[in-house]
UniProtKB/Swiss-Prot annotation:
This is Ribosome maturation factor RimP. HAMAP family: RimP. Required for maturation of 30S ribosomal subunits. One of its GO terms (biological process) is translation. Coiled coil: none annotated.
């Protein structure tokens, strides 16, 4: 269902100059919550941007009726520190510092240099490039340095 929602709202969000990072539908305290997270290629995602996107996609979602039950729409930035789960997440996080944990228990910190549909390239501290297929990644999380 979230894939259908993504397909419906992604073009609208891009027409406003922003990028759709993720869509998730969760249940918290008996409430269905539709979370839409954004990236602003020109800077931060402000509260005004979240409100603008929410006001535009809310009626669109109501008309499409993808979610049968009542839900709460939350629009937010993708966040400074987040787990990368899909090739799209990796592609939208290029150039960011990440902590990588592999399925073989190896871990390292690096800069995410490139990503495609099946693997990601990481620049290590010694400037060597390490290519890893997604199937070999256990967890990749962006790191924000203060």
């Amino acid at each position: 269902m979230t894939k259908r929602i993504e397909e419906k709202i992604e073009g609208v969000i891009e027409s406003l100059g922003y990028l759709l990072y993720d869509v998730s539908l969760v249940k918290e305290n008996e409430h269905n919550i539709l979370r839409v997270s954004l990236k602003n290629p020109n800077g931060a995602v402000s509260l005004d941007i979240c409100q603008q996107v929410s006001e535009i996609i809310s009626p669109l979602l109501d008309v499409c009726d993808f979610i049968q039950d009542a839900y709460i729409l939350e629009v937010s930035s993708m966040g400074l520190e987040r787990v990368l789960k899909t090739p799209k997440h990796f592609k939208l996080s290029l150039g960011e510092k990440v902590e990588v944990k592999l399925t073989n228990k190896e871990s390292f910190q690096a800069v995410l240099k490139d990503a495609n549909d099946w693997s990601a390239d990481f620049e290590l501290e010694n400037h060597a490039i390490k290519s890893v297929e997604y199937k070999d990644l256990k967890k990749v999380k962006t790191l924000f340095e203060w």
